[in-house]
């Protein structure tokens, strides 16, 4: 079987948050209690939001558009030893895809108001899925090297180690310069 060299995804929207730079972004949504943001779904995808407001939480799948891949061994947040990138949640990955479970506060048309946001402003949104505990929660899990470090999560913030200062957005900058469009 021959695999394609490239797989292309088209953003379905933009995530807006108070975090304009990677530094100081909470490193997980569970450490971003009550931080508000919005999801602006592009109009051509807004029909797909039908009934989303019936869910209290949603899963956002997005592209780490400013992450800079540095290799398969990384020194993750909350630990000073290198680990394989696939044993971490570091944003700099071969395929820089992020996921966050956030609270859905309100939907107005193609705009979703959310809380517990740990995402950089202007992040391209790839997909949205409803969070369903019966599907998504697992029991008797092992968390590897994080077992000794998970207590650091609440205060852990991005220090910029995985991000590049030079980047190109994959859609028009004018969309990113109009955050007032995303306000409810």
Swiss-Prot record:
A Pfam family recorded for this sequence: TrmO_N
The keyword Cytoplasm is assigned to this record: no
NCBIfam families attached to this UniProt entry: tRNA_TsaA (TIGR00104)
Annotated InterPro entries: TrmO-like_N, UPF0066_cons_site, YaeB-like, YaeB-like_sf, YaeB_N_sf
Domain of life: Archaea
Amino-acid positions noted as binding S-adenosyl-L-methionine in the UniProt annotation, renumbered to this chain: 26-28, 65-66, 89, 120-123
Keyword annotations from UniProtKB, A to Z: S-adenosyl-L-methionine
Protein name: Probable S-adenosyl-L-methionine-binding protein PYRAB06630
Upper taxonomic lineage: Archaea, Methanobacteriati, Methanobacteriota, Thermococci, Thermococcales
Entry similarity comment: Belongs to the tRNA methyltransferase O family.
TsaA-like domain residues: 9-140
């Amino acid at each position: 079987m021959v695999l394609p060299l490239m797989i292309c995804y088209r953003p379905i929207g933009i995530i807006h948050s108070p975090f304009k730079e990677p530094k100081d972004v909470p490193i997980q949504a569970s450490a971003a209690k009550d931080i508000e943001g919005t999801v602006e779904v592009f109009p051509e995808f807004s029909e797909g939001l039908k009934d989303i407001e019936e869910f209290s939480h949603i899963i956002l799948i997005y592209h780490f558009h400013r992450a800079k891949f540095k290799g398969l061994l990384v020194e993750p947040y909350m630990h000073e030893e290198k680990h394989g990138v696939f044993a971490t949640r570091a944003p700099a990955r071969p395929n820089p895809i992020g996921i966050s479970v956030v609270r859905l506060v309100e939907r107005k048309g193609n705009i979703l108001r959310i809380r517990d946001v740990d995402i950089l402003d202007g992040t391209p949104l790839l997909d949205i899925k409803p969070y369903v505990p019966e599907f998504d929660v697992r029991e008797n899990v092992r968390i590897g090297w994080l077992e000794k470090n998970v207590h650091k999560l609440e205060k852990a913030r991005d220090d910029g180690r995985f991000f590049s200062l030079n980047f190109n957005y994959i859609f028009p900058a004018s969309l990113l310069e109009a955050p007032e469009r995303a306000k409810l």
